[in-house]
């Protein structure tokens, strides 16, 4: 739903919250956690909202630039974001015991949509071209070869603490 990403976005990052409890009760105290993969779907929704006129183009570019700038500062592991981040800080929020590093699948969900944004705005005005360039840089910094671990496969996760212990080939 477009409103989840537009109205409900975490204010510092502009990304989608992992969850929203309408009653305001967060037993895990995780109300500031943002989801990388879910934000990818949300970014695609923002782009559709801009194209269809639900979001004014300049406001959409401003939000997408906020997201790109945040992602540049946020924790990354060989260019790949973790499954979750703490929205206010951009620091990794572990998804599980050994899942405290790069999550290639979730990052690719996000990057797919960001690449659509890049293509959509690449020939636009000065701000739009700058946004497209920021996204292009983020994409180029994703070290897919690192996630091969020297093998003929790509792995889902890598952790600076646990290395390849999860070892899920894609």
Regions found by a protein language model. Give the residues of each.
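Surface-exposed patches in mature extracellular/periplasmic domains of secreted proteins
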Residues: 12-18, 54-60, 124-131
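Hydrophobic core segments within long, regular secondary-structure runs in both alpha-
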Residues: 2-6, 43, 61-72, 111, ...
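Sec/Tat-exported extracytoplasmic proteins
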Residues: 9-12, 46, 75, 118-121, ...
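Hydrophobic or amphipathic alpha-helical targeting/insertion segments
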Residues: 51-76, 97
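Low-complexity, Ser/Thr/Pro/Gly-enriched N-terminal "stalk/linker" regions
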Residues: 1-31, 78
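Extended ligand-binding clefts on enzyme/binding-domain cores
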Residues: 79-107, 123-170
């Amino acid at each position: 739903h477009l409103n989840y990403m537009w109205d409900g976005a975490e204010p510092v990052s502009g990304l989608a919250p992992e969850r929203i409890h309408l009653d305001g009760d967060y037993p895990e105290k995780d109300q500031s956690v943002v989801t990388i993969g879910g934000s990818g779907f949300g970014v695609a929704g923002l782009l559709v909202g801009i194209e269809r006129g639900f979001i004014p183009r300049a406001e959409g570019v401003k939000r997408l630039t906020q997201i790109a700038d945040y992602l540049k500062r946020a924790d990354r592991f060989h260019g790949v974001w973790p499954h979750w981040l703490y929205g206010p800080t951009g620091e990794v929020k572990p998804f599980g015991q050994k899942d405290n590093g790069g999550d290639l699948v979730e990052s690719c969900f996000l990057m797919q949509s960001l690449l659509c944004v890049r293509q959509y705005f690449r020939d636009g005005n000065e701000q739009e071209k700058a946004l497209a360039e920021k996204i292009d840089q983020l994409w180029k910094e994703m070290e897919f070869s690192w996630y091969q671990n020297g093998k003929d496969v790509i792995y889902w996760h890598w952790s600076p603490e646990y290395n390849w212990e999860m070892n899920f080939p894609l």
